[in-house]
Amino acid sequence: KDDVTIYPDFYVERTYQGKDKKEKKLRIYESRDEINKLCIMDGALPKNDNEIVIDRMFADNNKTKTGDKLTIDGKTYTVSGLVSFSDYTTMFENNTDMMFDSVNFGVAMGTKEEFKTLSEKSLTYNYAWTYNAGDPADDIEEKKWSDDLMDTVVDAAGEGGGATMLGSMLGVLNMDNGIDDYVPRYANQAMNFAGDDLGSDRGSMLAFLYILIAVLAFIFG
């Protein structure tokens, strides 16, 4: 469809035992070049197949630092760096979760070659998209655009993929392999929760400041 550009953003999920002896889940993405890029907070991106980067907040909560080893599926990986994912400012495993969990759930990225190996066992077909007309003016416009896109996706799924670019990208969809989730950016808690929470905190702090000024004026007035 001419209105959007679709990007594969596949991932696999693996578990490992943390230093607290509890099971941790990592959502591991393929190396990204175009969308949902990473910010390197410490170390470097993986260069070798036995290297991995993980979210900095998840790493801090699990006392993991650059250079540490993680054993996943019987293979030992070196944490080459700590990063911040632009699409995971908070660790929501599912968009419907009431609260994020950055202790037991984190996101990670390996090399393209290692991702191919990991994805041989299981793979989640996740896609991202951008609007070719640019960013929507506000949440109202984005909702309209995303609703229109959803209608197109449903039509493509019903036709088993179709001949369009969108249909080709979503050609894996059929009666037995449908859409599990559809989350536009404005409704994505993992992307927006931190900013929304900061905004609500600002309002609370301003209210507290006004009350404090009133109390001080009463005491010293």
What does each model-found stretch correspond to?
Residues 1-221:
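Membrane transport/envelope proteins' first extracytoplasmic loop
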